[in-house]
Amino acid sequence: MAEESNVHVKVAMADVMALFVIAFFTFLVGGLGLGVFDQPAILASIAVPVGILVLVATIITYLNENVLGTAIFGPLAVFFLVFPFIPADSAGMLALVYIGLVMLIDTVLSLAQPVRLLPIVLFIAAIAFIVTGLWYNGGATDATL
């Protein structure tokens, strides 16, 4: 008989680390939108470390057989890793709308979970990505919209 072996990484929930760094990035986006920062380069400089930490969380959730966490954090890790290379034009807008659609798909997938807070948070994140994508037209100000 063959023995079955499962590898589990014994750490305190990698999801929390991923959510923390995503929230940190979101605070910087909010600060840029509110005029606290005047250069969007701060987002590009912090996006790669955020992407690396979310990728680590994705690998840990995969090893812990958390398919939903892998489906949520995997595309976000790729998005944050390529964020500095997203142009400020219609292609950048489509990238943000695309990740918003991926979050909407994750929202539908998470409806099978017994916890109802996750679909709500994912839906809000999807709407935020889509609205940011529609606003992302080369750094326009509110007066030009």
What are these regions (language model features)?
Residues 38-51, 88-100, 120-121:
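Structural signature of hydrophobic alpha-helical transmembrane segments
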Residues 24, 51-52, 78, 100-101, ...:
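Hydrophobic alpha-helical cores of multi-pass transmembrane domains in eukaryotic membrane proteins
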Residues 94-105, 116-145:
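Alpha-helical membrane segments in multi-pass integral membrane proteins
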Residues 52-87:
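Membrane helical hairpin/interfacial module
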Residues 60-70, 108-120:
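Membrane-helix interface "capping/anchor" motifs
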Residues 1-61:
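N-terminal topogenic module of multi-pass integral membrane proteins
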Residues 9-12, 35-41, 85-92, 113, ...:
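Extended, compositionally biased regions that are outside compact catalytic cores
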